[in-house]
Amino acid sequence: MTESLDLELDGINTEQRLLERRKAASERERLKQEVEDMVNLHQCKRGIFCVVKQAKLTYEKTTTGNRLSYKLPTQRQKLVLMVGEKPITVTQHSAETEGCLHFPYQGPEDLCTLIKTMCGIRDLIPFN
């Protein structure tokens, strides 16, 4: 018997595990699509500079609530200021930022609430 397949003689337990894995994978895919749809529908005054649009988001439903995890990529900004006739170049780097929002309740609008919170998070928590 191969260890990677976890096959059993009767096959019933193996079949049950495979069905559970398929169901879990299907649910993860559905949640991933739901997040993509919410991100595409999200509109605010920040436009493409909104954290919701810039971050890589993953959404999980658990027995203790819902979690929206985010990962913001490294960013580099460059600004040239003129002082008299001499240019001053300012370069700023921000490190990769990751975190998550945990919503301990279950409801039909949980993802929407988490997306709105994520949108306003830049005002609450300073990102570089």
UniProtKB/Swiss-Prot annotation:
GO terms for biological process: symbiont-mediated perturbation of host defense response; symbiont-mediated suppression of host apoptosis; symbiont-mediated suppression of host NF-kappaB cascade. The keyword Ligase does not apply. Disulfide bonds: none annotated. It holds the Pfam family Adeno_E3_15_3. It is found in: Host cytoplasm; Host nucleus. Keywords: Early protein, Host cytoplasm, Host nucleus, Host-virus interaction, Inhibition of host caspases by virus, Inhibition of host NF-kappa-B by virus, Modulation of host cell apoptosis by virus. Its main location: host cell. One of its GO terms (cellular component) is host cell cytoplasm. Belongs to the adenoviridae E3_15 family. May bind to host IKBKG, OPTN and RRAGA. May prevent Nf-kappaB activation by immune signals like Tumor necrosis factor, presumably by inhibiting NFKB1 dimer DNA-binding. May act directly at the TNF receptor to inhibit signaling. This is Early 3 14.7 kDa protein.
